[in-house]
């Protein structure tokens, strides 16, 4: 257990990556009995929760609770419920309050009053959440906070008092005392709560500039703590800790009405999870072996029963944790200012930066000469159209003939027109603008921008952030070494590969087809070419986006496999269903195969966020490659191909398409 305990010490110190690594390595040695294994997994769940990976943490806690129950260990079972409530507090305060209340009752039945008070603290913090329909009794909050402090739990006492402070500010209530002092030994989440409490007080007093400064200071502290995380998985997950500060800063920025202020805060949010420069991990034979076994199990059982196999879950978990610990941070990328971004915009280019405060949506329209904020009051009605959009798109791709095709198409056209009107009609009215850079919040993730009437046939790119877009050279021609890979069972896949190869005939493209298109061969090819085209069936894993991928001859090529590519291509074209889909984490971060490629260094990815008909993909992308080979940029080639072929499809460019 010594190595496991070292991991727990790292957890208490806030060294999450080190804690996860130590606990992972110690698990086979420390978990010699079911009880010992359950104790180890409870601690690991706490580390996962602090890293923002709450779903896995809660799944782990749910699996260990029955172990303590079977062995008649009610105290340990109640402690698991306490940890479960702590995790739920970050995203589901109603459930957290119930879980904490159950734990508190169990502790009191055992005579464990101190533990019961700790559970009461979580229950009250859940009630003080802005998302809770019930509020907490302030007198009880003070009583429990004092009891926690008297019992030596200063961190938890401070967190409870700060939560009450934020709750009072949100309701415009007076404060009887200054903001609770945060101890220097406080955990990162409590330190951030301190900044949020001061920002909330300032906002309630109408001092928005102070609210923004406090929020920014807290986010800077989070950045300093985040530097060790090179893994995309961890970088996007720790955004959990930034939620309150981002809402406070963005809301205060929106109230200013100033484009420069709102732009700064929109970039803060987008830049947060990709500001750490990842150091590519060294070759890991064990990780490669685990991924290969996962592939084999998945491809060998088409029924999906492999998902129920505990060994599969163990392999998946082990692969994730090896990647977390192996990928380190290599410094912080500086966030671009509005003036720096404007200097990169020529007369024909405009940036449309969509900003969501949690209640309102606006777009900052930026050109080289000016920036203005355009409110989008029609957003509330348009938002109701999003839930059914994916179903309409999927049906339109699947039902292309017969009497139902017209019905489906009309429903989709109406939905797209309404979204376009609400989101873009005012924003694209930029004199002289012929191409657009879009940056979007998580609430708009999955929008098929290329199909919205305001952008049909127009040149645009969906960037991770304005900072990342501006870091790349403009209008770089695509070419050099070209690679093509075709997965199994793709209708017109061979024809599509022929069209791509014909477009690049002068470059002698390297091709992998049939049984030659294995995962190892494709990852090796990716490391040799400047442009990679993959025609394969895609798969998006909602629970674990880095296990998304596409099917090759011997199984799925996962997002994790890209760590095996020493130098990724400049441009990647993913002609596969769902390859452009993403999962949204903590309201902002979108993670999927497109993001994995860009995190690894790819400049532009062409993909679709929804199902695409095979014939549309073949014809449209074949025409796009002809444009690329003729010297057009990625976004322009795709837009021109859509106009020339008359094909309206959800393919769009992510990253820097021009």
Q: Language-model segments: which ranges?
A:
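Amphipathic alpha-helical protein-protein interaction segments
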Residues: 142, 146, 172-182, 188-196, ...
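Residue at a conserved register position within TPR or TPR-like alpha-solenoid repeats
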Residues: 10, 48, 88, 127, ...
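Basic/polar, acidic-poor N-terminal "presequence/leader" segments
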Residues: 125-136, 154-181
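Residue-level detector of the short coil/turn that links helix A to helix B
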Residues: 14, 52, 91-92, 131, ...
């Amino acid at each position: 257990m010594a190595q496991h305990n070292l991991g727990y010490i790292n957890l208490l110190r806030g060294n999450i990556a080190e804690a996860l690594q130590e606990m992972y390595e110690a698990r086979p040695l420390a978990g010699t009995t079911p009880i010992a294994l359950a104790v180890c997994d409870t601690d690991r769940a706490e580390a996962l929760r602090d890293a923002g990976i709450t779903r896995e943490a809660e799944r782990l806690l749910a699996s260990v609770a029955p172990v303590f129950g079977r062995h008649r260990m009610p105290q340990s079972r109640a402690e698991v419920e306490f940890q479960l409530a702590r995790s739920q507090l970050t995203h589901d305060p109603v459930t957290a309050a119930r879980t904490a209340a159950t734990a508190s009752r169990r502790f009191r039945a055992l005579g464990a009053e101190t533990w019961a008070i700790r559970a009461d603290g979580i229950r009250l913090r859940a009630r003080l959440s802005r998302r809770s329909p019930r509020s907490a009794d302030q007198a009880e909050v003070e009583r429990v906070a004092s009891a926690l402090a008297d019992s030596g739990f200063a961190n938890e006492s401070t967190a409870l008092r700060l939560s009450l402070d934020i709750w009072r500010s949100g309701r415009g209530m007076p404060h009887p005392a200054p903001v609770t002092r945060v101890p220097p030994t406080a955990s990162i989440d409590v330190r951030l709560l301190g900044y949020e409490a001061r920002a909330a007080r300032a906002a309630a007093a109408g001092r928005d500039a102070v609210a923004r400064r406090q929020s920014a200071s807290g986010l800077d502290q989070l950045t300093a703590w985040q530097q060790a995380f090179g893994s995309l998985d961890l970088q996007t997950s720790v955004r959990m800790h930034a939620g309150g500060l981002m809402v406070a800063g963005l809301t205060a920025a929106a109230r200013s009405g100033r484009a420069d202020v709102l732009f700064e805060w929109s970039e803060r949010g987008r830049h947060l999870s990709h500001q750490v420069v990842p150091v590519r991990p060294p070759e890991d034979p064990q990780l490669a072996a685990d991924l290969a076994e996962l592939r084999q199990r998945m491809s060998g059982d088409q029924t999906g029963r492999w998902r129920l196999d505990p060994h599969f879950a163990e392999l998946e978990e082990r692969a994730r944790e090896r990647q977390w610990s192996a990928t380190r941070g290599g410094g912080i990328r500086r966030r671009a200012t509005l003036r720096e971004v404007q200097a990169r915009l020529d007369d024909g280019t405009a940036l449309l930066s969509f900003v969501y405060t949690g209640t309102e949506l606006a777009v900052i329209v930026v050109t080289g000469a000016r920036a203005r904020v355009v409110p989008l009051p029609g957003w509330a009605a348009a938002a109701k159209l999003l839930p059914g959009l994916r179903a309409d798109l999927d049906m339109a791709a699947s039902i292309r003939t017969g009497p139902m095709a017209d019905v489906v198409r009309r429903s989709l056209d109406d939905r797209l027109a309404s979204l376009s009107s609400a989101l873009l009609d005012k924003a694209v009215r930029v004199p002289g603008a012929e191409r657009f850079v879009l940056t979007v919040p998580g609430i708009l993730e999955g929008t098929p921008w290329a199909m919205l009437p305001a952008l049909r046939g127009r040149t645009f790119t969906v960037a991770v952030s304005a900072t990342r877009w501006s870091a790349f050279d403009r209008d770089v021609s695509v070419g050099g070494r070209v690679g093509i890979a075709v997965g199994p069972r793709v209708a017109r896949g061979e024809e599509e590969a022929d069209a791509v190869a014909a477009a690049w005939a002068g470059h002698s493209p390297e091709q992998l087809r049939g049984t030659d298109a294995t995962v190892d061969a494709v990852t090796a090819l990716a490391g040799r070419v400047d442009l990679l085209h993959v025609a394969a069936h895609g798969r998006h894993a909602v629970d674990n986006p880095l296990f998304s991928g596409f099917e090759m001859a011997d199984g799925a090529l996962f997002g994790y496999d890209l760590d095996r590519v020493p130098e990724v291509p400049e441009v990647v074209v993913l002609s596969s269903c769902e390859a452009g889909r993403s999962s949204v984490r903590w309201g902002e971060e979108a993670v999927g195969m497109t993001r994995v490629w860009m995190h690894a260094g790819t400049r532009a990815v062409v993909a679709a966020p929804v199902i695409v008909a095979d014939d549309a993909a073949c014809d449209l992308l074949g025409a796009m490659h002809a444009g690329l080979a003729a010297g057009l940029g990625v976004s322009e080639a795709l837009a021109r191909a859509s106009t020339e072929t008359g094909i309206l499809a959800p393919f769009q460019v992510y990253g820097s398409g021009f």
